Amino acid sequence: MTPSHLGQVLAVLRGPAVAFTRPGSRSAVAKSAATGPVAVDALGLHGDEQGDLRVHGGPDKAVHHYAQEHYPAWQSELRPLPVLDAPGAFGENLASSGVTEKDLCLGDQVRIGSVLLEVSQSRQPCWKLNDRFGVADMARRVQHSGRTGWYYRVLEAGALQAGDAITLVARPWPQWPLARVMAVLYQQPFDAAVLTALAALPLTPSWRRLVEGRLARGGVVEDWTARLDGTPHQP
């Protein structure tokens, strides 16, 4: 396909994993904007960390992207929160303008700087957003809204920086915008044919378990409580 312009990177963010809010927990959700080019390899941005490698990071979740377009909606829906005053509220590595979950499809390949990225999955929000925002149901709000952000795997390492263009270079599954995937998984009634079609794609392991498990249970939805709410002693 002919490469097409999608948007622009507004900020590149990274940060260390530190002790978080609950006993034994760690998080790198609080990130700082980088100046100048940042190297990116198969595991993400150099200088960035993840607090819980069981559910964050790795090749399928190497880079987290969140649309700055969503910030006004959150500012309108929530009480004034300083965390929303600048990019990085959701622990994203890339903040951008011009592209949201409606504009990107599963498997899309995008070029940012010299880095080639592939959309691997949408974010599945967890309880750490509740604690970061001081809003008890923030993770549920993010999931229900579809304003989740998304992850990339890195196909070609390189460097990127704020101001870089976001260019679409391949779209193998135009029928699967991320917004549709999230609606199928979290909003719409069970449709075996639609989930079967989704299962035919090369999904990440976590999404494959989710989709195939739901099909095997005849549409019974998995319990999201631990992920969305955590426990007082969440590790």
Name each model-derived stretch.
Residues E101, Y152, Q161:
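Short, flexible micro-motifs
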Residues S96-G98, G149-E156:
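Short alpha-helix capping/helix-loop boundary micro-motifs
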Residues M1-D131, D137, A170-P235:
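Electropositive, beta-rich accessory/interaction domains or terminal extensions
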Residues A136-R153:
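A mid-sequence, solvent-exposed acidic-amphipathic segment
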